[in-house]
């Protein structure tokens, strides 16, 4: 499998990213996986050595791409346009359509894996009923309404500041669980390579507008959903009941697999249980193909 960096095109906007492409064509129907990162991280979130979803997909022979969203990577200047969650969905819908038609494959369809704001965007993409074959969405680090402290933090950033840079050390306190849940020899330091300035607009949007949009968007999702919310989540209220309330918003979803994920914080991937979590997501992607 070939490990490469890529440039994707969405509504005429160039978006950077990375991927793993099988070197030989499989006779087995496979999902084409597209990973969508959250706020303050680039697509490298999914490719931190030792914690890489891309590497684990590669080990299973699954084609996978992670796209730098508008305002990240080579499209960082686009942050000046104040992209919202819905803007992200529209642009990425176009970029994924381009990917689907230009990548030579025998994939049965596409499965989105979205984290945090990337999970909200994945829901918004699914709600658009895209023209390319969407088979399912796997979500984590998102809910119905963020905690008040998270909203207040971003609202205080001046509106004229297009990009927000958060010191990695400050992010660690919000994104990781208790010390026993991650390997101190590696994390959180290794995650800092994936940190990136984020468009202020999306950070405000997830707190101010997402709670008003989520029920409408979730009701328009008509593909299977895999949802895991970490036990030590600090950006969203979390317990078994809130996980189920979120799942119940997907009233037209044909299959829902929702659960509280133990022993991890917001960035589940970077915890000791990250490998098990990613295996669950990849297994879900395969089930989407089997049930298509």
Question: What are these model-predicted stretches?
Answer:
Residues 30, 37-42:
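Active-site glycine-rich loops that stabilize anionic/oxyanionic intermediates
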Residues 151-239:
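Alpha/beta-hydrolase
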Residues 231-264:
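Conserved loop-alpha-helix segment in the C-terminal half of the alpha/beta-hydrolase fold
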Residues 40-53, 239-241:
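The serine-hydrolase catalytic nucleophile loop
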Residues 1-25:
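N-terminal cap/lid segment of alpha/beta-hydrolase-fold proteins
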């Amino acid at each position: 499998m070939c490990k490469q960096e890529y440039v994707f095109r969405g509504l005429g906007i160039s978006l950077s990213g990375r991927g793993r492409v099988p070197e030989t064509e499989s006779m087995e129907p496979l999902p084409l996986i597209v990973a969508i990162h959250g706020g303050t991280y680039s697509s490298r979130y999914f490719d931190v050595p030792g914690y890489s979803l891309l590497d684990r997909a590669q080990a299973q022979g699954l084609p996978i791409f992670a796209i730098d969203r508008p305002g990240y990577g080579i499209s960082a200047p686009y942050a000046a346009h104040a992209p919202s969650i819905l803007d992200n969905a529209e642009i990425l819908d176009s970029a994924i359509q381009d990917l689907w038609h230009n990548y030579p494959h025998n994939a049965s369809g596409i499965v989105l894996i979205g984290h945090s704001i990337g999970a909200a965007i994945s829901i918004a993409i699914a709600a658009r009923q895209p023209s390319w074959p969407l088979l399912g969405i796997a979500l984590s680090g998102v809910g119905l309404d963020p905690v008040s402290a998270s909203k207040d933090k971003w609202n205080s950033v001046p509106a004229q500041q297009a990009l927000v840079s958060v010191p990695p050390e400050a992010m660690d306190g919000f994104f990781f669980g208790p010390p026993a849940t991650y390997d101190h020899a590696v994390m959180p330091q290794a995650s800092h390579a994936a940190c990136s300035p984020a468009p202020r607009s999306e950070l405000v949007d997830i707190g101010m507008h997402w709670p008003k949009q989520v029920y409408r968007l979730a009701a328009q999702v008509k593909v299977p959903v895999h949802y895991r919310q970490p036990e030590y989540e600090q950006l969203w209220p979390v317990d078994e009941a809130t996980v189920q309330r979120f799942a119940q918003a997907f009233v037209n979803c044909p299959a829902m697999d929702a659960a509280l994920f133990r022993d991890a914080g917001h960035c589940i991937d970077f915890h000791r249980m990250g490998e098990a979590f990613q295996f669950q997501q990849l297994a879900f992607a395969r089930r989407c193909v089997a049930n298509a």
